[in-house]
Amino acid sequence: MDDNKRPLYLPFAGPAILESPLLNKGSAFSEEERIYFNLEGLIPWVIETIDEQAARAYAQFKNFTNDLDKHIYLRNIQDTNETLFYRLVRNNISEMMPIIYTPTVGLACERFSKNYRRNRGLFISYPNKDRIDDILNNSTRHKVKVIVVTDGERILGLGDQGIGGMGIPIGKLSLYTSCGGISPAYCLAVTLDVGTDNPQLLEDPMYMGWRHQRIGGDEYAEFVEEFMQAVSRRWPDALIQFEDFAQKNAMPLLERYKDQYCSFNDDIQGTAAVTVGSLLAACKAANSKLSEQRITFLGAGSAGCGIAEAIVATMVSEGISDQQARSQVFMVDRWGLLLDNMPNLLPFQQKLAQPCATIEAWDNYSDNISLLDVVNNAKPTVLIGVSGSPGLFTEEIIKAMHSHCKRPIVFPLSNPTSRVEATPKDILNWTSGQALVATGSPFEPVIVNGETFEIAQCNNSFIFPGIGLGVLSCGARRVSDEMLMASSRALAECSPLGKDGVGSLLPRLEDIQTVSKYIAFAVAKAAIDQGLALPCTDELLQQSIEANFWEPEYRRYKRTSF
């Protein structure tokens, strides 16, 4: 029987129900519920359906003139009535996703302490390092299945936001529910408050976090270890998603924990999975294979290198050698093209550095090979931006790329919109509409020579909700590289441009729940094939996915005692 059709038995009544976001129905409580739960007089006379409530909420939403106010309004609904919040977002997903997540969430993080209204999630501060178990036990969520955790050090392209980074886990989990159907009762946002190195926050009298320089080294590692062990004790089957950790910590934490816990890093692995999926779709639209591409990255941090490694793995799966695949990937950072003789390369960069011997014959060879030099010499067919610096994909660079590539694939992925390497409008105008474009933040359609181009948002929201739903539906013990590759291939199979030759590279946001279920099935199948989940028939797996997919509908309440 569908959970939404079963009554929920509650032992308490009155304001306690109205003040619980997971239980509150507002004006939708029935006459019987109002009597039995002592709600008469506490809410207006009229009994409404959830869609009537959503219509009023949407009208109020439209009265706000700026995106931050809209974000605050939606968060207030979420903190008052979660079922209504998710019904409203589901009904208006394209309009509201940019409000509850990127790009608006960046500004919300910057103003977190100034706009703080009500608690949500857990703040685990370093001075409380010996009481993490107690803090987890204080959570209002008792059956946690998905945790999104940040330390606030690298929030989007905005840098260190301290506890203001909590806006990111809250936003991510909103998408786990609205896109992936994971019940909000199973979701927990966590911020590890280890201080901040942002002087503006340290000097701000309204800042609500631990007012201290960030801890690092062994202290930091031990604190994170205590947190992971405590979570394992409290919720041993929970999926843990690392979010917006700084480069110096992101990859080491991923390597340390990916084989110990059911965990993944969305900035590295989620971004890689959605990018590979988008590239596979673009390659299909261009009648080519990923293994045939020459790919240049602007940005060689953990996210960029994570994408590059996923691309290499996918190329190898198409039949070329690892060495050949790496020879087709060029990483450029602030110091120029990564070369194997450069000092101070991080371990994850070393494997992607080009041998000097193969580059010495290039025109304009020097110790600092610019992005333009790489484009002119390597002649890439794919250009990916994860630099966090706006405007670096110049007209000269894009036109140079187009001169040797009829349909260049250009992905300026930096978030938020203010950090994008080039706008889709410019890229398409510079290439006479020939480029295949996907961006990290949402952009309006572009008209070039009378033709309208839908801009695909290469956003992790197309991937991580499906991964979460797949993990929960099959009971996977880990998140493997094979599961992530399966998610990429499943996403590519959903591409309108890849399937039909027209439309966007990625599906419409209105179809994201269907896409998430499709990805969940592929992810769960990969987990089962690897022995990371118990064997299951396709039919039972599909039934499990549907059973785990939560819908924003009110349940009937029954009183257990008076």
Swiss-Prot record:
Which GO molecular function annotations are given, in alphabetical order?
Answer: malate dehydrogenase (decarboxylating) (NAD+) activity; metal ion binding; NAD binding; oxaloacetate decarboxylase activity
Family as reported in the entry's similarity comment: Belongs to the malic enzymes family.
Q: Tell me which stretches of the chain form a coiled coil.
A: none
- Catalytic reaction annotation: (S)-malate + NAD(+) = pyruvate + CO2 + NADH; oxaloacetate + H(+) = pyruvate + CO2
Q: What is this protein called?
A: NAD-dependent malic enzyme
Q: Which residues bind a divalent metal cation?
A: E243, D244, D267
Q: Where is this site: Important for activity?
A: D267
* Cofactor annotation remark: Divalent metal cations. Prefers magnesium or manganese.
Positions contributing to NAD(+) binding? R154, D267, N415
Q: Does the keyword Transferase apply?
A: no
**GO BP annotations, alphabetical order:** malate metabolic process
Q: Which domain of life is it from?
A: Bacteria
Matching SUPFAM superfamilies: Aminoacid dehydrogenase-like, N-terminal domain, NAD(P)-binding Rossmann-fold domains
Fill in the subunit field for this protein.
Homotetramer.
Do you know which SMART domains this protein is assigned to?
Answer: malic (SM01274), Malic_M (SM00919)
